[in-house]
Amino acid sequence: MSVEQSLLGKETQYPTSYQPDVLFPIARAQSREKYAHIQGITQGKDWWHVFEISWLNAHGIPQVAIGRITLPASSPNLIESKSLKLYFNSLNFTQFDSTQSFIETVEKDLSAAAGAKVELTLFQVDDLETSKPQGICIDDLMPERLEQHPDATLLKLDESGEEIEVELYSHLLRSNCPVTSQPDWGTVFIRFKGKKPCYRSLLAYIISYRQHNGFHEQCVEQIFADIWQNLQPEKLMVYATYTRRGGLDINPCRVSDLTWMPKPIRLARQ
């Protein structure tokens, strides 16, 4: 199904009964065609935090929780966010014999839409704590030039030629939803092993996404691919934590080496 057929940007009725067929899969293949040769594009996970989860227990009493969805980057499909919101709303008045039964139902439905095994972890509403970013923040640097759209030629190696392993982050990631043009805000983490990158050039490159139209997952994969091709690291991780919209936040992570897979976190802006 094409993105244009999705419910994004359209007025919709919120379902009041269980409706798994509202889930809208979007194939990853088309946006990955030009990156097919790059190691790590399909390695990683998409973590979603779902803050508006509710269902009825066996006695008809509402239950609430915060959920973390784990979707493998190797899945053939991602799931469009508004359809996921509508799906969880459809469970608000549905009775389940147990919390485990609720989890199993959600995992079954999301796995069918994604085309791969999806996991759901539930947290009590007070249990999902925020973390502080680790690494070097590059936001106070001064880029040599700025561009309005993603430009991989901005990426440069440091003149020192030094070999390093470093984790950098920036809170200045901004892109637009490709359907509604609404802004998406995020913090991006880049863990890098190889010849030292020019940090100012990395910041300029991140800033160049500010008017780019792309889903969260696609932006992270483009950042990963451009750094991999232009800076040629030995190992690379790109992980973005996007702010919440409609009760959901999306956090894609791509790694060239599975030993570099981080644990999912939640930042203050989420």
Curated annotation (Swiss-Prot):
<dbReference type="GO" id="GO:0006400">
    <property type="term" value="P:tRNA modification"/>
</dbReference>
<comment type="similarity">
    <text>Belongs to the GTP cyclohydrolase I family. QueF type 2 subfamily.</text>
</comment>
<keyword id="KW-0671">Queuosine biosynthesis</keyword>
<feature type="binding site">
    <location>
        <begin position="79"/>
        <end position="81"/>
    </location>
    <ligand>
        <name>substrate</name>
    </ligand>
</feature>
<dbReference type="GO" id="GO:0008616">
    <property type="term" value="P:queuosine biosynthetic process"/>
</dbReference>
<feature type="active site" description="Thioimide intermediate">
    <location>
        <position position="177"/>
    </location>
</feature>
<feature type="binding site">
    <location>
        <begin position="245"/>
        <end position="246"/>
    </location>
    <ligand>
        <name>NADPH</name>
    </ligand>
</feature>
<dbReference type="InterPro" id="IPR043133">
    <property type="entry name" value="GTP-CH-I_C/QueF"/>
</dbReference>
<dbReference type="Pfam" id="PF14489">
    <property type="entry name" value="QueF"/>
</dbReference>
<dbReference type="InterPro" id="IPR016428">
    <property type="entry name" value="QueF_type2"/>
</dbReference>
<keyword id="KW-0521">NADP</keyword>
<protein>
    <recommendedName>
        <fullName>NADPH-dependent 7-cyano-7-deazaguanine reductase</fullName>
        <ecNumber>1.7.1.13</ecNumber>
    </recommendedName>
</protein>
<comment type="function">
    <text>Catalyzes the NADPH-dependent reduction of 7-cyano-7-deazaguanine (preQ0) to 7-aminomethyl-7-deazaguanine (preQ1).</text>
</comment>
<dbReference type="InterPro" id="IPR050084">
    <property type="entry name" value="NADPH_dep_7-cyano-7-deazaG_red"/>
</dbReference>
<keyword id="KW-0560">Oxidoreductase</keyword>
<dbReference type="InterPro" id="IPR029500">
    <property type="entry name" value="QueF"/>
</dbReference>
<feature type="binding site">
    <location>
        <begin position="216"/>
        <end position="217"/>
    </location>
    <ligand>
        <name>substrate</name>
    </ligand>
</feature>
<keyword id="KW-0963">Cytoplasm</keyword>
<dbReference type="InterPro" id="IPR029139">
    <property type="entry name" value="QueF_N"/>
</dbReference>
<comment type="subunit">
    <text>Homodimer.</text>
</comment>
<comment type="pathway">
    <text>tRNA modification; tRNA-queuosine biosynthesis.</text>
</comment>
<dbReference type="GO" id="GO:0005737">
    <property type="term" value="C:cytoplasm"/>
</dbReference>
<dbReference type="GO" id="GO:0033739">
    <property type="term" value="F:preQ1 synthase activity"/>
</dbReference>
<feature type="binding site">
    <location>
        <begin position="81"/>
        <end position="82"/>
    </location>
    <ligand>
        <name>NADPH</name>
    </ligand>
</feature>
<dbReference type="Pfam" id="PF14819">
    <property type="entry name" value="QueF_N"/>
</dbReference>
<feature type="active site" description="Proton donor">
    <location>
        <position position="184"/>
    </location>
</feature>
